[in-house]
Curated annotation (Swiss-Prot):
Organism the protein comes from: Azotobacter vinelandii (strain DJ / ATCC BAA-1303)
Keywords: Cytoplasm, Methyltransferase, rRNA processing, S-adenosyl-L-methionine, Transferase
Subunit record text: Homodimer.
One Pfam family this sequence matches: SPOUT_MTase
InterPro entries: Alpha/beta_knot_MTases (IPR029028), RlmH-like (IPR003742), tRNA_m1G_MTases_N (IPR029026)
GO CC aspect terms: cytoplasm
Any one GO molecular function term: rRNA (pseudouridine-N3-)-methyltransferase activity
Primary location recorded for the protein, binned into one broad class: cytoplasm
PANTHER family assigned: METHYLTRANSFERASE, RIBOSOMAL RNA LARGE SUBUNIT METHYLTRANSFERASE H
Listed name of the protein: Ribosomal RNA large subunit methyltransferase H
Catalytic reactions on record: pseudouridine(1915) in 23S rRNA + S-adenosyl-L-methionine = N(3)-methylpseudouridine(1915) in 23S rRNA + S-adenosyl-L-homocysteine + H(+)
UniProt: S-adenosyl-L-methionine binding residues: L73, G104, L123, S124, P125, L126, T127, L128
Amino acid sequence: MRLRLIAVGSRMPRWVEEGWHEYARRLPPELALELLEIPLHTRSKNADVARLIRQEGEAMLGKVQPGERIVTLEVAGKSWSTEQLAAELERWRLDARTVNLMVGGPEGLAPEVCARSEQRWSLSPLTLPHPLVRILIGEQLYRAWTLLSGHPYHK
């Protein structure tokens, strides 16, 4: 099974890249975790933000192949405990489809992306900085995998 994080934004600080790669490399090859970055369009004072969000959404959906699962990360999504995330991860594994985790830009996800989502996941009711979200997703997926594998990381 492939897990892909499709996120709006690029040129993250080095600590973000290191944190992401640390958790991605810890996962086994049969649970490959990949990051696809969608460039964030420049938001000027007079920018048509709705149009920019639509363009970013189109670019995100352009990375998804027919039949692949889309899971959007949204504040209004469902909060999962570690055990619940582990159960979802196991369901995704058994489903054998690529799972695309979608993280929008500063204004969120395009409505077209949300409409295609099979599941909505909320990391927290708090507004989190996008660089930190990447690391949190990687760590939580790793933690869920260790729980399923009986690894002592999750205690």
